[in-house]
Amino acid sequence: MLSIGMLLLLFGMFREKYASSDSASEATQTNVEQVGKVKNIIFIIGDGMGPNQINLVGDSANNFERSHSIGFSKTYSASHRVTDSAAGGTALACGVKTNNGVLGMNADSVPVQSIMQELRQSGLATGEVASCRITHATPAAFYAHQVNRGMDAEILSDLYKYGPDVFVAGGNKLISTDSLQNAGYQVTYSLDSMANIADGKVACILAEEDMPTSPMRGDTIAQGVLQTLRLLEKNEKGFFLFIEGSQIDWAGHGNEGERLRAEMKDINRVIGVCMDYADQHPGTLVFITADHETGGLSLPNEELTPTFSTGSHSGVMVPFFAYGTGADKLTGIHENTDFKALLLSLVDCR
């Protein structure tokens, strides 16, 4: 596990390396400070993504290095020193520690609204894009309120009632098209057909269960993000978009080094798309973090060969990165429960 001292050293190295950026980056940072309040939030979770996973992206076109600020997040849950994705996702989405396995509730099983739900009540559009099924623990933490992450039928009921305005994910095997349509969704099964939808609620379901692994799914997630942004940006008040690199976690569980490298390169591509969008749309904040680290990854030799110490999650702190409007307010070491309030405090409509 990384010690506090090592984390602070990494933090200092990042600050030193990027404090003296080129003139273009300095101009971007100046614009960031001038814009003020945030209109749009793009919240990205790399499930299972610890500090060493980020090294697998490589030095070429590493979009994490474009970040305006960086910090670290503590990931323990209310019940365990090592969290699962349900409790970790709930902490990030709802701002409360809860027990492993619980979605959208505190440790006493009382439902708590997520940042996505609160911003929708304030009039913002909402969206989700994930490489897993839409009912999986992390995406579900932003809309569901259930005592057990395995309660698929109940989570689906919450999706129909409280789900995002637009989503791109898997899960067709479980989902009822009639129920989605009754909830006001236009249902589509390809990004090409999604591109023909001008506005309104949209469910784009791209797999029976979870999406294929990277690189077999190509740039599906990045393209899904672009399609979702196209629809969400029509809301003049702004939007909240949640994105998950779901299968980083699964590669860690399987101790599959090259699969992990491919998944990290995919989320890096998605982050680049989002940062480019923020450059073109002042008032947009891109926030990137993880719910936990998976695999106890180390990179012990010159070839950076992925080496794992566990097939489960670990208890290390995970990094977070911020880019765009308000990024300067997000730095340091935080509880994972801090980010909901921090992000809400930056939003223009509140």
Question: Can you annotate each of these PLM segments?
Answer:
Residues 106, 188-225:
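Functional beta-strand-loop-alpha-helix junction segments that form "active/interaction loops"
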Residues 51, 265-302:
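Metal-dependent active-site segment of extracytoplasmic phospho-/sulfohydrolases and closely related
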Residues 18-171, 176-194, 200, 293-350:
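N-terminal catalytic scaffold of extracellular/periplasmic and nuclease hydrolases
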Residues 243-247, 252-254, 264, 288-294, ...:
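Active-site proximal loops enriched in glycine and acidic residues that flank catalytic Cys/His/Asp
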Residues 1-24:
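Bacterial Sec-dependent N-terminal signal peptides
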Residues 43, 204-206, 240-244, 287:
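Structural motif
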Residues 137-143, 208-211, 217, 225-229, ...:
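Active-site His/acidic residue clusters
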Residues 95-99, 203-213, 249-254, 321-322:
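Gly-rich Lys/Arg/Thr-decorated short loops/hinges at beta-loop-alpha junctions or inter-strand turns
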